[in-house]
A protein has these predicted regions:
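A short, flexible loop at the N-terminus of ABC-type nucleotide-binding domains that lies
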Residues: 9-38, 70-75, 88, 127
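Conserved hydrophobic segment flanking the Walker A/P-loop of ABC-type ATPase nucleotide-binding domains
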Residues: 43-45, 91
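ABC nucleotide-binding domain signature
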Residues: 50, 90, 94-104, 110, ...
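The feature captures the beta-strand-to-loop junction immediately N-terminal to the Walker
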Residues: 52-54
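Helix-to-loop junction immediately C-terminal to a conserved catalytic motif
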Residues: 67
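Conserved ABC transporter NBD signature motif
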Residues: 75-94
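Short helical segment in ABC ATPase nucleotide-binding domains corresponding to the A-loop/adjacent helical element
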Residues: 104, 113-121, 131, 135
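Conserved ABC ATPase "signature" region
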Residues: 128-144
């Protein structure tokens, strides 16, 4: 991202936006310059958004921030506000999915169902319920 501010304005529905950023910025640990500066935007539930920019400008960092997977303070410094349906990204973790740029680098197991189960395990889903959730999740995206 550049220093240019992205602005969508207030929610027309009056509801809490799915994603809301106000002056959000992020600097990776060990870097002098922030990769994200003063990002302001609202994304409504169901809205489709294209995030476009040159390599290295912060697209993946913004998406990782929204998904709540940027790490702790030792990994970098966030400024401003970023909310997912009114909650911090860390407290909303699991409500937002993130597909990485290289799909091969994000699969660990030989079977996709095992990777889906891994996510459920990390969210604390009861072991007896994981199989049902894995099947339901794979059905939603047309995998069996």
């Amino acid at each position: 991202m550049t220093d240019e501010e992205l602005t969508r304005g207030p929610s027309s529905s009056g509801n809490v936006p799915a994603v809301s950023a106000r002056g959000f910025g992020y600097r990776h640990a060990g870097r002098k310059a922030a990769v994200l500066n003063d990002i302001t935007l609202d994304v409504e539930r169901g809205e489709k958004v294209l995030l476009l920019g040159a390599s290295g400008v912060g697209k993946s960092t913004l998406l990782a921030a929204i998904a709540g997977v940027l790490g702790d303070d030792s990994d970098g410094e966030a400024t401003g506000e970023l909310l997912i349906e009114g909650c911090t990204p860390a407290s909303a973790r699991g409500a937002v999915g993130l597909v990485l740029q290289d799909p091969d680098s994000q699969t660990i197991s030989a079977r996709v169902g095992d990777d889906v189960a891994f996510g459920a395990e990390n969210l604390g889903v009861a072991p007896a319920e994981i199989g049902n959730r894995v099947r339901a999740s794979l059905d939603v995206v047309g995998l069996d």
